[in-house]
Curated annotation (Swiss-Prot):
One of its GO terms (molecular function) is insulin receptor binding. It comes from Rattus norvegicus. This is Tyrosine-protein phosphatase non-receptor type 11. It is an enzyme of class 3 (hydrolase). Substrate binds at residues 425, 459-465, 506. It comes from the Eukaryota.
């Protein structure tokens, strides 16, 4: 399980019912502290339009439902009953299903809050990426509803690589909507608490000073709260000497990871293949390149095209199965690579092509025309393409093409080319709505074709706009699959696609645009959820909402996804033997410098 924000630490039973009935669907659930038995918990589940409350006992040794299976943590109990449908029943035998976790909002939008992170994971992060004084805040796994401040400490010199460096964990209690570290002053928010101890460091009884010098920021966010993260990333630097801030800081950190992705590109560097590359240094990784199998066996370089397979990893990790959708990221065709392009499309059984560039921009060729005129037929080497029809939407042109091998015209395949025409020559679109509507149409088409191969995406170099479109589409697919309350990680997703094709997402503007597009998608989706709830209450049929104000010429919106995630993934348990060095063992040093 990748998140435990189904736990709501500060709500009553009435508030839980209201949340589940207004934001949830049948099968939605949450956990909360028991008001009648302090220390115990309650599982609230929506079923048949009503809410059932189930008591969870915390004996101090284990968690259970007053009988039955016993668990070390609340998270393990919830995960077990999510995975084992039919195990949770009422006295009359009716099954209670836990399908969709209804997540609680993060207690803060600060980037130092890492949410569901174990102690071991925090130590690994702080050791590998932090330095003396680096800190983060996370949810407590042993005490649901509380939090933990994890700080990297070192010797007095603050040498980050010193063998004496360690990580200290301080429990943060949350009681009656106030936060404290087991004694002393209480604070209205986690942010107030952290700011206080940044100025007034805590000191262990052994003398170690817990200096909160610099936050170790997370890039993980709850998709539903992306507006708060965008607001944080958009803040100006606090001081003029602090250049790195927000989007620029995240993107620059991502750029510094490129040295970890120096995979071989020998095939693209071969002398015989150099004229097949639009840009001499933008080459495909060997381990993910598309290998053409139908070439001349006497011509070893006939298997080469500047293209890579991109496989989203979020599904394979959770489901151990082949992803529903994959991509081919490739460059814009050259005159001498058009034949190879169509060989690739045919070989991979690709049925959808996404073109994100004009043929010529600012007087420079970006992609040669690789399709025939409307109602015309043209042969490209061993492949034949027939342009059946073209239709123009506001931002793109849709072409219906028939592809076959020369001499095998009776085995034509339909290939749909979506040509996005309104990406500006400089920068990125001012409104992400047009891109989202475009990707929605592409998604519907791909979904409608049985056993369709990878979606082919290209611009000119096949990395900038191509990477931006693919990353946005992957993130939206995660939200479709897991719901608006799922976790997403923009830099991690970009790093994942960059491990399969070098340089995907080229500029800070493209990086920022990804955030803006996902934010726009979430806002629109939340409006649709609200409208659906209103319509259900009124008994009216639900009306779709478009991502942009421009009327589109084809396709309805996709069915509304569940509000919350379904597939549970394995989670790391907190080490029960881990000792919290809490403020009971510390004293406050107010004037430390």
């Amino acid at each position: 399980m990748t998140s435990r924000r189904w736990f709501h630490p500060n709500i009553t039973g009435v508030e839980a019912e209201n949340l589940l009935l207004t934001r949830g669907v049948d099968g939605s659930f949450l956990a909360r502290p028991s008001k009648s038995n302090p220390g115990d918990f309650t599982l609230s589940v929506r079923r048949n339009g009503a809410v059932t409350h189930i008591k969870i006992q915390n004996t101090g040794d284990y968690y259970d439902l007053y009988g039955g299976e016993k668990f070390a943590t609340l998270a393990e109990l919830v995960q077990y009953y999510m995975e084992h449908h039919g195990q949770l029943k009422e006295k009359n035998g009716d099954v209670i299903e836990l399908k969709y976790p209804l997540n609680c909002a993060d207690p803060t939008s600060e980037r130092w809050f890492h949410g569901h992170l174990s102690g071991k994971e925090a130590e690994k992060l702080l050791t590998e990426k932090g330095k003396h004084g680096s800190f983060l805040v996370r949810e407590s796994q042993s005490h649901p509803g509380d939090f933990v401040l994890s700080v990297r400490t070192g010797d007095d010199k603050g040498e980050s690589n010193d063998s004496k460096s360690k990580v200290t964990h301080v429990m943060i209690r949350c009681q009656e909507l106030k936060y404290d570290v087991g004694g002393g002053e209480r604070f209205d928010s986690l942010t107030d608490l952290v700011e206080h101890y940044k100025k007034n460091p805590m000191v262990e009884t052994l003398g170690t000073v817990l200096q909160l010098k610099q936050p170790l920021n997370t890039t993980r966010i709850n998709a539903a709260e992306i507006e708060s993260r965008v607001r944080e990333l958009s803040k100006l630097a606090e001081t003029t000497d602090k250049v790195k801030q927000g989007f620029w800081e995240e993107f620059e950190t991502l750029q510094q990871q490129e040295c970890k992705l120096l995979y071989s590109r020998k095939e693209g560097q071969r002398q015989e293949n150099k004229n097949k590359n639009r840009y001499k240094n933008i080459l495909p990784f060997d381990h993910t390149r598309v290998v053409l199998h139908d070439g001349d066996p006497n011509e070893p370089v006939s298997d080469y095209i500047n293209a890579n397979i991109i496989m989203p990893e979020f599904e394979t990790k959770c489901n151990n199965s082949k992803p529903k959708k994959s991509y081919i990221a490739t460059q814009g065709c050259l005159q001498n690579t058009v034949n190879d392009f169509w060989r690739m499309v045919f070989q991979e059984n690709s049925r959808v092509i996404v073109m994100t560039t004009k043929e010529v921009e600012r007087g420079k060729s970006k992609c040669v025309k690789y399709w025939p005129d409307e109602c015309a037929l043209k042969e490209y080497g061993v492949m034949r393409v027939r342009n059946v029809r073209e239709s123009a939407a506001h931002d793109y042109t849709l072409r219906e093409l028939k592809l076959s091998k020369v001499g095998q015209g009776n085995t034509e395949r339909t290939v749909w080319q979506y040509h996005f025409r309104t990406w500006p020559d400089h920068g990125v679109p001012s409104d992400p709505g047009g891109v989202l509507d475009f990707l929605e149409e592409v998604h519907h088409k791909q979904e409608s074709i049985v056993d369709a191969g990878p979606v082919v995406v290209h611009c000119s170099a096949g990395i900038g706009r191509t990477g931006t479109f693919i990353v946005i589409d992957i993130l939206i697919d995660i939200i479709r699959e897991k719901g608006v309350d799922c976790d997403i990680d923009v830099p991690k997703t970009i790093q994942m696609v960059r491990s399969q094709r070098s340089g995907m997402v080229q500029t800070e503007a493209q990086y920022r645009f990804i955030y803006m597009a996902v934010q726009h998608y979430i806002e629109t989706l939340q409006r649709r959820i609200e409208e659906e709830q209103k319509s259900k209450r009124k008994g009216h049929e639900y009306t779709n909402i478009k991502y942009s104000l421009v009327d589109q010429t084809s396709g309805d919106q996709s069915p509304l996804p569940p509000c919350t995630p379904t597939p549970p993934c394995a989670e790391m348990r907190e080490d029960s033997a881990r000792v919290y060095e809490n403020v009971g063992l510390m004293q406050q040093q107010r004037s430390f410098r």
